[in-house]
């Protein structure tokens, strides 16, 4: 205990001596924003924290006893829980590198039960050498490109068409002039895949990504590839250890180009089991002939669902006024092997595809912005037919989990946002 106290005093003294040589504002910087939204939706929606703040998709058609659509009910809300605060610290050099530490949070909590509570967003340190960088801690998932994401007024950066996740990770980046290469290993954190809480931890191997970027003054583009392993169970319902795992791959590409008048952004991702990114995806048990030993022990094998998502975002460049539009599309491509659809774990297996288009206007004065946006979303949900003559007609799914019979549900969201940055 005494040794720990002495060590802390030595570190604190060293930091204070170093800090005296620099202005406090050069060392510690507080930043963030105070944001408040007024939102109106024409339909009940799947949303984050049930605050109409991050509307992901319109809810499906559900009829009451009179044949009226229950979810065709509008809602309105004021909220400011996405307000954010962070601190960035430029510390003394370490291991021959410049050091930076960041802690950032907001008030969304990590579930509906904890909304309005403080939530950790980022908590990382960076070691910057001349040509390379090591980032350790919680930061954006590699599929989320901090220099190329939608500029929506609505909170959520284009989710579920754009990945949205922050994860504990190790990320090493090497710079080759205009080209940079990075490798990342990460775990889920509180952005988890559906299923058991420790579904990734028990797989033992972190999710791994590699990425290559090309950047100039007015352009950035890149490609990336990721691999993830999950272990849905460690013991079966019949009390036998099972070691079955789910392997999934993701590939993505992005670009951003800036001209004098306009900025163009585009992104596309094809992947498996990406529900931890708040996107379509998941896994299910294989529909196959199992051995008698597997049946006796209750062991099942799994496969992933595939999905495709893409978006474009265009906006004008201005210091006091910007107009823009976002358009996104996602499609559920089912599995490559036959599955038992009743065992699916993930997001939106009951949706064939979904789209969104959202024009916006943003007014800027000093550190204050006023933004308004109209967001139209549509999702084609599974619609089975109990009177059908085949299993596919009855359930609305084929043997590979593809949705074959649909009905559309759509929603309009109107938003007015006031934000003060500091």
Predicted regions and their residues:
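Short sequence motifs at beta-strands and strand-loop junctions characteristic
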Residues: 24, 72-80, 115-117, 161-164, ...
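Detector for outer-membrane/organellar transmembrane beta-barrel domains
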Residues: 218-351, 355
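C-terminal beta-signal and adjacent terminal beta-strands/loops
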Residues: 367-399
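Bacterial Sec-dependent N-terminal signal peptides
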Residues: 1-22
């Amino acid at each position: 205990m005494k040794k720990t106290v002495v060590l802390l005093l030595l570190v604190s003294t060293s930091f204070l001596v170093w800090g005296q040589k620099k202005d406090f504002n050069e060392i510690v910087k507080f930043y963030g924003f105070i944001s408040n939204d007024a939102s109106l939706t024409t339909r009940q929606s799947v949303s984050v924290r049930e605050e109409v703040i991050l509307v992901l998709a319109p809810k499906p058609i559900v009829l009451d006893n009179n044949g009226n659509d229950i979810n065709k009910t509008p809602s309105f809300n004021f909220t400011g829980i996405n307000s954010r605060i962070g601190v960035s610290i430029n510390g003394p050099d370490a291991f021959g590198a410049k050091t930076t530490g960041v802690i950032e949070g907001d008030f969304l909590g990590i579930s509906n039960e904890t909304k309005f509570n403080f939530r950790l967003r980022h908590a990382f340190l960076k070691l910057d050498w001349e040509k390379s960088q090591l980032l350790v801690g919680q930061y954006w998932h590699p599929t989320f490109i901090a220099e190329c994401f939608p500029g929506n007024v609505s909170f959520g950066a284009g989710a579920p068409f754009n990945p949205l996740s922050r994860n504990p990770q190790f990320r090493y980046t090497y710079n080759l002039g205009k080209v940079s290469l990075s490798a990342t290993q990460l775990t889920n954190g509180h952005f988890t895949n559906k299923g058991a809480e420790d579904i990734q931890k028990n797989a033992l191997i972190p999710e791994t990504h590699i990425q290559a970027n090309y950047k100039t003054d007015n352009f950035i583009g890149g490609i990336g590839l990721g691999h993830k392993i999950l272990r849905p169970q460690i013991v079966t319902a019949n009390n036998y250890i099972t070691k079955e795992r789910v392997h999934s791959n993701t590939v993505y590409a992005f670009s951003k180009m800036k001209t004098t008048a306009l900025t163009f952004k585009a992104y596309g991702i094809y992947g498996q089991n990406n529900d931890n990114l708040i996107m379509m995806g998941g896994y299910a048990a294989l529909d196959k002939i199992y051995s008698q030993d597997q049946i006796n022990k209750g062991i099942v094998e799994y496969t992933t669902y595939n999905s495709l998502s893409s978006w474009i975002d265009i906006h004008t460049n201005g210091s006091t006024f910007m107009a823009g539009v976002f358009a996104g599309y996602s499609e559920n491509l089912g599995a490559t092997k036959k599955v038992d659809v009743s065992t699916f774990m993930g997001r939106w297996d009951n949706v064939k595809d979904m789209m969104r288009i959202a024009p916006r206007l943003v007014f800027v004065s000093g550190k204050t912005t006023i933004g308004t946006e109209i967001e139209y979303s549509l999702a084609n949900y599974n619609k089975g037919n109990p009177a059908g003559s085949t299993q596919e007609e009855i359930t609305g799914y084929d043997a590979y989990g593809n949705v074959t019979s649909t009905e559309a549900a759509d929603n309009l969201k109107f938003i007015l946002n006031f934000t003060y940055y500091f």
